[in-house]
């Protein structure tokens, strides 16, 4: 199972592209877009949770291998480690956490980031302008590189924050 967590504010074709690539390259059965009510590293979402969920469903359209889910009420947390622990209760699934190289740069600021890297595979999708920063990041230097699988990927050069500025 692949998990792409985020605020999806808004969801865009980059999210879809890395989901498709993860399924193709790593033979994943499905990808879960685990949407958060509030990203702890952002001030405020510009769209409501319901609007973001609706936007995600619109982007994925007929891609049945992607599910849009909101787990925070179920797990009583917006922390990635708690989501990973929730999925690890069912030991038959191998967990792959998907992130862009921009997230690896600040991954060491995430709650229990070392535990996250121990409990799942982390697929880091290259993003224009971030490869060097991510390879020089505290996270990458602190943890063994085998904790991360870098995916060379240059199909989409867009971010939700760029879209909000438009």
Model-inferred region functions:
Residues 1-166:
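Nucleotidyltransferase catalytic core that binds NTPs
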